[in-house]
Amino acid sequence: MRCVVYSIAKSSPLELVKIYQKQCRQFDCELELVDLFPKNTANAQKVSKKLAQKSYSLAFEPYLNPKAKNIALHPKAQRGDSFAFSKMLENHLNINFFIAGAYGFEENFLKDCQAWSLSEMTFSHEVAKIVLCEQIYRALSIIFKHPYHK
């Protein structure tokens, strides 16, 4: 299995994320983080919400894979517990997660993905990545009946 988290961000992986990446390997899952922040995104965010959203879509579109499960993290989307999250991931070999910038996704981009919400709360990119990586590891623990999730 391969899970890739694409985000509009400048930061590199945090230490805790590296721990979850290592733990996912025991389930034969390579957990990758790809931070994208093209030059046009910085300028677009200064101009308008619509232009910023368009720049996010342009950055992410090359990574949309019709053979993969594409999941966009969106605050108004479906949410569920860790078991529901694990069911959504189960039986997929390639999963792409997308975390937009401050202005969220364009509606057209969301049509190409399954939208999922981690919480009703707003998180910084760093916290969202940590929560997502932990939930991916927890989902794998549920799928493989590992004692991490009790």
Swiss-Prot record:
It comes from Helicobacter pylori (strain ATCC 700392 / 26695). It is an enzyme of class 2 (transferase). HAMAP family: 23SrRNA_methyltr_H (MF_00658). S-adenosyl-L-methionine binds at residues 100, 118-123. Its main location: cytoplasm. Belongs to the RNA methyltransferase RlmH family. Keywords: Cytoplasm, Methyltransferase, rRNA processing, S-adenosyl-L-methionine, Transferase. Specifically methylates the pseudouridine at position 1915 (m3Psi1915) in 23S rRNA. It catalyses: pseudouridine(1915) in 23S rRNA + S-adenosyl-L-methionine = N(3)-methylpseudouridine(1915) in 23S rRNA + S-adenosyl-L-homocysteine + H(+). One of its GO terms (molecular function) is rRNA (pseudouridine-N3-)-methyltransferase activity. One of its GO terms (cellular component) is cytoplasm. This is Ribosomal RNA large subunit methyltransferase H. CDD domains: RlmH-like. Homodimer. The keyword Protein transport does not apply.
